[in-house]
Swiss-Prot record:
Catalyses which reaction(s): [[Fe-S] cluster scaffold protein carrying a second [4Fe-4S](2+) cluster] + N(6)-octanoyl-L-lysyl-[protein] + 2 oxidized [2Fe-2S]-[ferredoxin] + 2 S-adenosyl-L-methionine + 4 H(+) = [[Fe-S] cluster scaffold protein] + N(6)-[(R)-dihydrolipoyl]-L-lysyl-[protein] + 4 Fe(3+) + 2 hydrogen sulfide + 2 5'-deoxyadenosine + 2 L-methionine + 2 reduced [2Fe-2S]-[ferredoxin]
Protein name (Swiss-Prot/TrEMBL): Lipoyl synthase
GO MF assignments: 4 iron, 4 sulfur cluster binding; lipoate synthase activity; metal ion binding
Free-text remark on how the cofactor is bound: Binds 2 [4Fe-4S] clusters per subunit. One cluster is coordinated with 3 cysteines and an exchangeable S-adenosyl-L-methionine.
Gene: lipA
Organism of derivation: Hydrogenovibrio crunogenus (strain DSM 25203 / XCL-2)
Cofactors that this protein relies on: [4Fe-4S] cluster
Amino acid sequence: MKARNESMSKGEYKTKSLKNRPDPTQPKLKKPSWIKAKLPSAKHIGRVKELKQVLREQGLNSVCEEASCPNLGECFGHGTATFMIMGHICTRKCPFCDVTHGRPNPLNQDEPRHLAKTIHAMNLNYVVITSVDRDDLRDGGATHFKNCTQAIRDKMPDIQIETLVPDFRGRLTVALDILAQQAPDVLNHNLETVPRLYEEARPGADYQASLDLLKRFKQMVPETKTKSGLMVGLGETFDEILQVMRDLRAHDVEMLTVGQYLQPSDFHLAVQRYWTPEEFKQLEQAGMEMGFTHVASGPMVRSSYHADLQAQGQFS
């Protein structure tokens, strides 16, 4: 793969070959007043720097930084983080996502040990482990997920672990069999958007395959909670989101997050609409009526934002 031209931004390089490439000259919608990320308080700034330093020393990546999450300051300030394993280079080029695309490096076989050591040093009670897509690996990275989960549990037997997994395209059966050998407390896989927008927003992904992943794992490991996440603002309708929620419940998904899509750069998909706090509240109420055990729905909600409280049904 050719190296990125230094004059080209990460977003421009990532989306330059897409069939439906976003138009960087498209006028941008003005952000409403309710789109505000919380900055870390003065007392938490030191903690944010400390956690970033720990990640660098252990050679680890946090999705909080790689995906430019708007809640980074708040979550790091409170001493929580979502760890991204298997490197920071993704084999997919979804035009809504700010993670780097390209040819990934070989797996770091010491990463599970380093990850467990770091989590132990941070004294976390709940941890979220996610990854880039690794279509270059025969099992999609499932064995590495399993090894990381095992290493963490060996170091901290009482910790709760949530894994936010990719779709394991073309190798789902093998991947699920491996993941079930060391099952997390919560298995999360994000549908991201409505099926009508998959070709544009999730090229290479399959809506039904993602639903099947969630249902099949729940059937294999009934005691593991299943979870998914959606973003809104790409042009979907309220009714389309409700239908996706119904599909999730029909596939035994118990927990849901819904948040506003925010454009990482001019070269990513543009925001078509900002949903109001009232609409997010309506989605939360509808989800609870459908039978979800918990729904976190709000403009700044992200898949792993306050994941520990979501798992305990304490965050709204």
